[in-house]
């Protein structure tokens, strides 16, 4: 919101400097982004009148003028502006004047003619937003000889504030003035708005077909309007200083309503509207050429203003080219309405638009403003353009107008939240000055919210308002009033951050990928898994909810490889979305951990090149995570997956249930995706690693450990993990460690057999074991293996 200080001070004029005023506005929560002077630094420029204007004898584009600056004689000034003419009141820089850029005005000759000053344009005075190429044209009653800075009030600044979306009430001079008046305990001096009596009868039928989107619509015909009149300088200057160019009186007045009151308005050429006026949703295949010349193909969720035949405007957004007011317009229809924020939210983005009107309607406009704005605009139109006024025609559905909430504020709640006692009298005063209708109770207040405050709904909103107006800087820094009790955490909980730390310590980097993925890539990886398809996706490449984190991780690998990053180790914790009719919203959300590695195992160094990562590198990293958990029954079972290499993949099992997978990406899929190298991936349900093994104190033996190696022959299909588990079971507490250090298949072994070389560590906490006792433990192990797996010692 951009406005000029002098306009604000017409409404409320606190005895503070510009800097103090800006500080007040910022402390009110309306952050001041910039404060800029209206004009450049200059002096010696006065109001003057062109008494004579003749053609320069030696230059076609120059004129020789006699100018009255209020001095004893007329000044001779040469001017090149096309709009220079006899009788015009102008801004004249006299001899000795200093213009912006330290440009000094001196007597000189131009093509042989004496020039004793300069007739100035806005840009030459450092006034921005001026597109005219001519000199300034002042009103005919401008007093000659008066300093132009004083006459135009150029000792003014433009203030721009950044508003949060909830403070739409401050998108106007009236709204800012209300806030400044509250903090300075002053009254707002708003312009007196009186109803304009009708001088003719010209009723307009209004048909509101979408009352929930537009519960209130007003229209008025004004006939015999002089659209070609010139907007008065005060109106042009108010708009200019707010960053809006003057176009014509009708548009300027509707823009004034928007800036002054916060009520967007629009004017139609009455001859181009065939009553009744309809407020409805767009029909299929309808189009509208907008004021900016673009053609909008209307969607059926768009609210429009229409007549019997055509769409006239996008309601609350932009008017149409066909019904706009132009130089030939004689009669106009003036419109003011309330459009519900939800009816307009997102519509501007559908058409690539953003207008001052839509910016306000999307956030909320005071529903009581339309009538005031209509009368204010009518008064100005009659004053500037003349015309005959018809009655105001109105259609209203009070059922759909915003309700004014009634909020109960408790004294105990106020003290608890703020942590500082504010007197009842002061609390009441603040609420009343904010425009609330307040009733005091023994233990609090009952407050009715004003129509312009859409952001006040609950008790905490009122507390925030009280603290804001009272002043956050006046609230002391006290200790918290709440009694806080530290809540203990279960020792068995394995925090996700602990798992992430293990991965980071192993040189992984955490990534966060979109939950929306390319359905084609996901189908390639998980052809048997149905996915949830979004009805309104961001793009076709992000139209499916992920059923695995694998899709996003592999796309991240490709993204990095395309940027010359060949050694990649990444992981992600996130949700996957599995369609399930029995789940809430028919989607089962599962938290998972996933990772992928590709490239070299280590960065190459002076010891030599590093080898590429393989299946067992990732399996080892995963086993470090599993070692933290209480689930010691987690196992790896060979299994084929569509996305993985058939000979290098496994399911992660817990109590005969599949809880994850690990493996090498299928070469054909890697080729289709354009991924270089051989990525290895895993995905694991987060619930499986949510509990950690609680540490148990064990006695450390002071007696020597005894290592013995055995080599057994078993069927090749028997997993080594089952053999190791059987060893532990047989050796009991005296077998402290079992390690597989070699696997052999080939010569000297029967086909279908394999040899496992296992190291056994035997130790007792109470004594040194004898050879006989050691041999007894080994024999127990061999007997167990022979019984369960028909294992035999290798010769």
UniProtKB/Swiss-Prot annotation:
GO CC terms, sorted: phenylalanine-tRNA ligase complex
Q: Which cysteines are joined by disulfide bonds?
A: none
Q: Where in the cell is it found?
A: Cytoplasm
User: Boundaries of each B5 domain copy?
Assistant: 402-477
Q: What is the enzyme's main class?
A: ligase
Which biological process terms from the Gene Ontology are attached to this UniProt entry?
Answer: phenylalanyl-tRNA aminoacylation
Cofactor note (record) = Binds 2 magnesium ions per tetramer.
UniProt KW rRNA-binding keyword: no
Q: Give the EC number(s) listed in the UniProt record.
A: 6.1.1.20
Binding-site list for Mg(2+)? 455, 461, 464-465
- Which InterPro entries does this UniProt record tie to the protein? aa-tRNA-synth_II/BPL/LPL (IPR045864), B3/B4_tRNA-bd (IPR005146), DNA-bd_dom_put_sf (IPR009061), Fdx_antiC-bd (IPR005121), Fdx_antiC-bd_sf (IPR036690), NA-bd_OB-fold (IPR012340), Phe-tRNA-ligase_IIc_bsu (IPR045060), Phe-tRNA-ligase_IIc_bsu_bact (IPR004532)
Record-annotated tRNA-binding domain positions: 39-149
CDD domains to which the protein is assigned, alphabetical? PheRS_beta_core, tRNA_bind_bactPheRS
By its UniProt entry, which Gene3D superfamilies does this protein fall under? Answer: 3.30.56.10, Bira Bifunctional Protein, Domain 2, Ferrodoxin-fold anticodon-binding domain, Nucleic acid-binding proteins, Phenylalanyl-trna Synthetase, Chain B, domain 3
Q: Which domain of life is it from?
A: Bacteria
**One MF term in GO for this entry?**
tRNA binding
- Assembly and binders: Tetramer of two alpha and two beta subunits.
Q: What is this protein called?
A: Phenylalanine--tRNA ligase beta subunit
Q: Which gene encodes it?
A: pheT
């Amino acid at each position: 919101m951009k406005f000029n200080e002098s306009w604000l001070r017409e409404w409320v004029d606190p005895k503070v400097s510009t800097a103090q005023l800006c500080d007040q506005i910022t402390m009110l929560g309306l952050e001041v982004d910039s404060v800029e002077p209206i004009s450049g630094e200059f002096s010696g420029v006065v109001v003057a009148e062109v008494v004579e204007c003749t053609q320069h004898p030696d230059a076609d584009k120059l004129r020789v003028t006699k100018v009255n600056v209020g001095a004893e004689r007329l000044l001779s000034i040469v001017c090149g502006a096309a709009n220079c003419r006899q009788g015009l009141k102008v801004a004249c820089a006299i001899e000795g004047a200093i213009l912006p850029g330290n440009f000094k005005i001196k007597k000189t000759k131009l093509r042989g003619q004496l020039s004793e000053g300069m007739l100035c344009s806005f840009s030459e005075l450092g006034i921005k937003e001026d597109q005219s190429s001519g000199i300034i044209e002042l009103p005919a009653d401008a007093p000659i000889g008066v300093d132009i800075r004083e006459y135009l009030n150029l000792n003014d600044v433009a203030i721009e504030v950044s508003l949060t979306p909830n403070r739409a009430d401050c998108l106007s001079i009236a709204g800012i003035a209300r806030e400044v008046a509250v903090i300075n305990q002053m009254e707002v001096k708003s312009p007196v708005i009186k109803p304009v009596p009708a001088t003719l009868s010209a009723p307009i039928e209004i048909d509101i077909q979408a009352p929930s989107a537009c519960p209130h619509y007003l229209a008025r015909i004004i006939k015999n309007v002089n659209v070609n009149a010139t907007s008065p300088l005060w109106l042009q200057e108010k708009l200019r200083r707010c960053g809006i160019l003057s176009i014509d009186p009708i548009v300027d007045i509707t823009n004034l309503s928007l800036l002054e009151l916060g009520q967007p308005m629009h004017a139609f050429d009455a001859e181009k509207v065939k009553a009744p006026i309809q407020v409805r949703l767009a029909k299929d295949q309808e189009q509208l050429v907008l004021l900016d010349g673009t053609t909008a193909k209307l969607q059926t969720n768009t609210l429009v203003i229409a007549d019997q035949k055509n769409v006239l405007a996008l309601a609350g957004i932009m008017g149409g080219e066909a019904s706009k007011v132009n130089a030939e317009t004689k009669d106009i229809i003036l419109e003011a309405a309330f459009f519900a924020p939800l009816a307009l939210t997102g519509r501007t983005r559908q058409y690539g638009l953003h207008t001052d009107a839509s910016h306000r309607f999307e956030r909320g406009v005071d529903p009581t403003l339309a009538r005031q704005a209509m009368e204010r605009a009518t008064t100005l139109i009659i004053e500037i353009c003349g015309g005959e006024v018809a009655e105001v025609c109105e259609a209203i559905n009070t059922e759909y107008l915003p309700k004014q909430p009634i909020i109960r504020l408790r004294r105990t709640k106020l003290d608890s939240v703020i942590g500082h006692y504010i007197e009842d009298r002061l609390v009441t005063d603040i609420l009343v000055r904010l425009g609330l209708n307040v009733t005091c109770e023994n233990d609090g207040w009952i407050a009715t919210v004003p129509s312009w405050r859409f952001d006040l709904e609950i008790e905490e909103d009122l507390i925030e308002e009280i603290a804001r107006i009272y002043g956050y800087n006046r609230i002391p820094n006290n200790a918290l009033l709440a009694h806080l009790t530290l809540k203990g955490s279960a020792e068995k909980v394995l925090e996700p951050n602990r798992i992430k730390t293990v991965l980071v310590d192993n040189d992984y980097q955490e990534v966060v990928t979109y939950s929306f993925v390319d359905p084609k890539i996901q189908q390639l990886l998980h052809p048997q898994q149905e996915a949830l398809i979004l009805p309104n996706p961001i793009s076709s490449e992000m139209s499916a909810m992920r059923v695995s984190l694998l899709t996003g991780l592999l796309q991240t690998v490709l993204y990095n490889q395309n940027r010359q990053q060949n050694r990649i180790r990444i992981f992600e914790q996130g949700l996957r979305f599995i369609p399930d009719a029995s789940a809430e919203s028919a989607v089962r959300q599962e938290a998972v951990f996933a990772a992928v590695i590709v490239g070299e195992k280590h960065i190459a160094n002076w010891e030599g090149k590093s080898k590429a990562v393989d299946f067992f590198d990732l399996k080892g990293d995963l086993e470090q995570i599993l070692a933290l958990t209480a689930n010691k029954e987690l196992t790896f079972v060979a299994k084929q997956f569509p996305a993985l290499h058939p000979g290098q993949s496994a399911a992660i099992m817990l109590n005969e249930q599949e809880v994850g997978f690990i493996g090498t990406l299928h070469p054909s899929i890697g080729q289709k995706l354009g991924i270089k190298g051989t990525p290895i991936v895993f995905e694991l349900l987060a619930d499986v690693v949510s509990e950690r093994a609680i540490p148990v104190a064990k006695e450390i033996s002071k007696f020597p450990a005894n290592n013995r190696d055995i080599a057994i022959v078993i069927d090749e299909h028997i997993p080594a993990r089952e053999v190791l588990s059987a060893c532990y079971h047989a050796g009991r507490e005296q077998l402290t460690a079992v390690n597989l250090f070699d696997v052999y298949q080939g010569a000297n072994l029967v086909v279908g057999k394999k040899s496992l070389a296992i190291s056994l560590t035997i130790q007792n906490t109470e004594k040194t074991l004898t050879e006989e006792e050691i041999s007894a433990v080994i024999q127990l192990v061999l007997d167990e293996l022979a019984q369960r797996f028909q294992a035999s010692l290798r010769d």
